[in-house]
Amino acid sequence: MDRKEQKSIIEGLLFVSGDEGIYPEQIAKVLEIEMNEAINILEEMQQECEGANRGLQIVQYAKVYRFATKKEHASYYQKLIDTPTAASLSQAALETLAIVAYRQPITRTEMEEIRGVKTDKALQTLVSHLLIKEMGRAEGPGRPILYGTTKEFLDTFGLKTLDDLPPLSEENEQMNEADLFFGCLQEIWK
């Protein structure tokens, strides 16, 4: 495998690792190269991103590498955040939102155990839409972030309090929480 292909694969690995980032050891294992070689490639890629007219940079914090946006573009990102969007939430985001609404405060890991898949993207979407927020930290190893719904969540779905959420009766416990939640909300909106 040539250097260009290695960089392409590393770029993809950085992307899919998201905010958690990736260790050079992981890259070395995936590419079946020495760790020093992985670090050299990452450093080359950092320089290429800095020198080029690109919107992303590769940053390193505590031995972890990840993509980050450039500070000089921050005003444009803020405009995007401030721009109302008509885009609806994905099914994954809706399922995650229902889990948070009924089980809050809840950690990302607990959500992933319920859904059976990663929730990183859905969480980012829900936080950016101000429907959920960090509510604190759980006790225990790593002190994971606890998530809960926001006032904007209540406003968006026409709820005064969380007590207005459709109840989970025994017959509905087997039903998908997202389907139940949004089915009941459709009844409320009629």
Swiss-Prot record:
InterPro entries, per database record: ScpB_csome_segregation, WH-like_DNA-bd_sf, WH_DNA-bd_sf
A GO CC annotation given for this chain: cytoplasm
Subcellular location: Cytoplasm
Keyword Isomerase among UniProt keywords: no
Listed GO biological process terms: cell division; chromosome separation; DNA replication
Major localization listed first in the record, in broad terms: cytoplasm
SUPFAM superfamilies per the UniProt record, alphabetical: Winged helix' DNA-binding domain
Entry keyword Cytoplasm: yes
UniProt entry keywords in alphabetical sequence: Cell cycle, Cell division, Chromosome partition, Cytoplasm
Oligomeric form and interacting partners: Homodimer. Homodimerization may be required to stabilize the binding of ScpA to the Smc head domains. Component of a cohesin-like complex composed of ScpA, ScpB and the Smc homodimer, in which ScpA and ScpB bind to the head domain of Smc. The presence of the three proteins is required for the association of the complex with DNA.
PANTHER family: SEGREGATION AND CONDENSATION PROTEIN B
Function of the protein: Participates in chromosomal partition during cell division. May act via the formation of a condensin-like complex containing Smc and ScpA that pull DNA away from mid-cell into both cell halves.
Stated family: Belongs to the ScpB family.
Protein name: Segregation and condensation protein B
